[in-house]
């Protein structure tokens, strides 16, 4: 449960505090309607969220209340993959302080160079539900004989975790964007390369957990999840096909059904995705998935007059510039999430012959 030190009830109750309080209450109510209630050991609420330039202070620093809103959203999940964390971890550490002592994170190093954009990948998770199982690394493509392999612009990050009975290797990625045909080709190639790399790794790993009879011990088998911001244009585009065609990765029906309008603010692009590898493992989707559009409740267009004086931008302060400024407060992406079942006790017992 997030902690809001700046709203201490012992301090003077200003108009600004009332404004923040009312929106936090509304946000809590709407999250409770949209996101299933968290369980102790039955389900895992998994999300991916590109939090725009967290935190570059490009349009001025994020407001204290913004951190409260971000923390409130994250706290309704058990595990969140976050893209666009900056080299300076101050913003992430501040967020963790608001989330509370039961939350932890693991973060990658930045990818050097212009294309890397000084970004990190992070996994933020509730330690009451999820534990790190000691493997973390970055995806580096093997060299092909006679050719130079172009590496990822922003190196995908793979980490192993366990939640109840569910063991998973999860990779978060932020695909190259680029411009024109060349940019889209590199983007498509990156998506396909990441998926195929993980497919090959999974096959290799499965061979290592066979018993003396050559049978796979599925209880030692980790599921593979690939998620993040792939800059996918739409579901008919090659960028989408690169994730699933010939890679053994699939996007659950629940995610496809509830992600009909996209995950960008305009709801017309399918940049963010959550994909799972088809294999002999324990992976069972719950009945819920979705995209949470927080702009229906906070930083709304009706709030422009309130925030106008706080906007640190060049040029005129109008509704158009406000809608851009607010994406540097919250994000230009919306969180995409899925519910997974993680209690396999009955399956385990039924396997005992």
Indicate where each model-derived feature is located:
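Divalent cation-coordinating acidic motifs and surrounding scaffolds
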Residues: 1-353
């Amino acid at each position: 449960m997030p902690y809001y030190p700046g709203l201490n009830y012992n301090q003077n109750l200003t108009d600004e505090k009332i404004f923040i309080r009312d929106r936090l209450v509304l946000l809590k109510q709407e999250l409770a309607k949209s996101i299933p209630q968290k369980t102790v050991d039955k389900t895992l609420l998994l999300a991916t969220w590109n939090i725009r330039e967290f935190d570059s202070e490009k349009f001025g620093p994020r407001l204290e209340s913004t951190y409260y809103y971000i923390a409130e959203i994250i706290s309704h999940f058990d595990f969140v993959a976050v893209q666009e964390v900056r080299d300076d971890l101050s913003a992430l550490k501040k967020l963790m302080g608001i989330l509370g002592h039961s939350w932890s994170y693991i973060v990658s190093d930045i990818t050097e160079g212009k294309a890397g954009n000084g970004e990190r990948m992070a996994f933020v998770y509730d330690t009451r539900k999820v534990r790190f199982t000691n493997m973390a690394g970055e995806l580096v493509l093997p060299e092909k004989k006679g050719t130079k392999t172009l590496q990822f612009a922003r190196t995908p990050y793979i980490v192993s975790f366990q939640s109840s009975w569910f063991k998973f290797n999860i990779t978060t990625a932020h695909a190259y964007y680029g411009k024109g045909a060349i940019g889209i080709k590199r983007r498509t190639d990156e998506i396909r390369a990441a998926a195929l790399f993980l497919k090959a790794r999974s096959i290799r790993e499965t061979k290592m957990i066979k018993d003396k009879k050559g049978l796979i011990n599925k209880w030692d088998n980790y599921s593979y999840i690939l998620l993040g911001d792939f800059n996918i244009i739409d579901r008919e585009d090659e960028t989408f096909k690169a994730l699933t065609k010939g890679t053994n990765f699939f996007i659950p029906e629940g995610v496809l059904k509830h992600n009909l309008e996209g995950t960008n603010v305009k709801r017309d692009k399918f940049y963010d995705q959550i994909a799972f590898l088809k294999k002999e493992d324990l992976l069972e989707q719950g009945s819920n998935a979705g995209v949470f559009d927080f702009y229906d409740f906070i930083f709304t267009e009706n709030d422009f007059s309130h925030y106008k004086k706080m906007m640190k931008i060049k040029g005129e302060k109008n509704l158009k510039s406000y809608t851009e400024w607010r994406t540097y407060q919250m994000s230009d992406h919306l969180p995409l999430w899925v519910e997974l079942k993680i209690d396999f006790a009955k399956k385990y017992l039924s396997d005992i012959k």
